[in-house]
Amino acid sequence: MRINPTTSDPGVSILENKNLGRIAQIIGPVLDVAFPPGKMPNIYNALVVKGRDTLGEEINVTCEVQQLLGNNRVRAVAMSATEGLKRGMDVVDMGTPLSVPVGGATLGRIFNVLGEPVDNLGPVDTRTTSPIHKSAPAFIQLDTKLSIFETGIKVVDLLAPYRRGGKIGLFGGAGVGKTVLIMELINNIAKAHGGVSVFGGVGERTREGNDLYMEMKESGVINEQNLAESKVALVYGQMNEPPGARMRVGLTALTMAEYFRDVNEQDVLLFIDNIFRFVQAGSEVSALLGRMPSAVGYQPTLSTEMGSLQERITSTKKGSITSIQAVYVPADDLTDPAPATTFAHLDATTVLSRGLAAKGIYPAVDPLDSTSTMLQPRIVGEEHYETAQQVKQTLQRYKELQDIIAILGLDELSEEDRLTVARARKIERFLSQPFFVAEVFTGSPGKYVGLAETIRGFKLILSGELDSLPEQAFYLVGNIDEATAKATNL
């Protein structure tokens, strides 16, 4: 591990024996830098611009080389605002890619894309750093075992189970509960698996990032008294940051997660909220770098950029990175190139439905649209598979009958269909669950439901043993015993 030139002691002069260039052109967040002949920096090298603006304020901007243009010029993308920069300013080639602090020192802290702490809690130990650009693990290092990653959330574990070391997409428009679901998962993983999480906030609202941090402190995921006991490291490149920062902050978070996996040999959860913003930042920069746009104005390198991030998220023989990525779907159009490219990399999809959120069923996970490659009898077992299929069939039949019910009413249905509808409505409500992180809003304590309990509960509903209970008894409860207890009080 090398000393990090971008975050090391600012008192040390970095100009000695360094490759010096000068700014030749500035186009928004993109800089052209001229270097002496034969002294061109490598692609992805970090460049640092230091100087003073017209008001005498100090400027310190880090950039990343993207293209070698010829005529001894390189084109670089700035990781922070370029206000105050002017032509002719000195630029230092650091000789290495951006490097960020990794290891236990990162837990409980908030970082920016450069690995600098932004939480006003003092400096971070930067003796152990790692470059953000790496190749994916070799095939021989990969772990091919298939195992389920239990989340304690009924609808997820039963109908679209997550794979340990897999990639999961959380799909949904604005305001259907993606961020709350992510927070619940961080909470459950910390408590049930004792694992660490890394949260990458890519191009989302700063307010939400702040709320998440405050709620993590309240729920104990971040331990203020002893930061080393915290379960999560946070890396933010929010909406107000330049596209360079939003484009690379996902890699910064991933680099921190890789260290926990490869060196500490831990199981890690990597959250990316939102992967769409990673693509969006790439498309903002792409045109300025002089690339021809492709479909819908996205960058022509869309699938390559996505692949270079996603292929590093995997399980090795040492540990695993399970990644949960919120995917904003522009205008709810799943065929848009950004979500469509993301789909290719995912093992499971959790689709959030506005219709369920409107009914007050939270988490608003759509049981019919959510999918998982893990839902196979040879992986999850015959009992789990059969229960999940029966639940889906019951809900699908209810969906088909809804038009008839809306026009003619329940009375026109056959006895069998009426029973199916009654059970489907119970299942729909039983798929809801009180969350630990939502206790503050709902007042009801959160529930973690193990997979065996979940399967037992749905089997009882499907068998007809609970047909006599009112459907309200199944709403926002944990396991099936709580539903029967609630029914006696109704």
Swiss-Prot record:
The keyword DNA damage does not apply. PROSITE patterns: ATPASE_ALPHA_BETA. Its EC number is 7.1.2.2. The modification Phosphothreonine is found at T6. It is a peripheral membrane protein. It is found in: Plastid, Chloroplast thylakoid membrane. GO terms for biological process: proton motive force-driven mitochondrial ATP synthesis. Keywords: ATP synthesis, ATP-binding, CF(1), Chloroplast, Hydrogen ion transport, Ion transport, Membrane, Nucleotide-binding, Phosphoprotein, Plastid, Thylakoid, Translocase, Transport. The keyword Membrane applies. Belongs to the ATPase alpha/beta chains family. F-type ATPases have 2 components, CF(1) - the catalytic core - and CF(0) - the membrane proton channel. CF(1) has five subunits: alpha(3), beta(3), gamma(1), delta(1), epsilon(1). CF(0) has four main subunits: a(1), b(1), b'(1) and c(9-12). Produces ATP from ADP in the presence of a proton gradient across the membrane. The catalytic sites are hosted primarily by the beta subunits. This is ATP synthase subunit beta, chloroplastic. The gene is atpB.
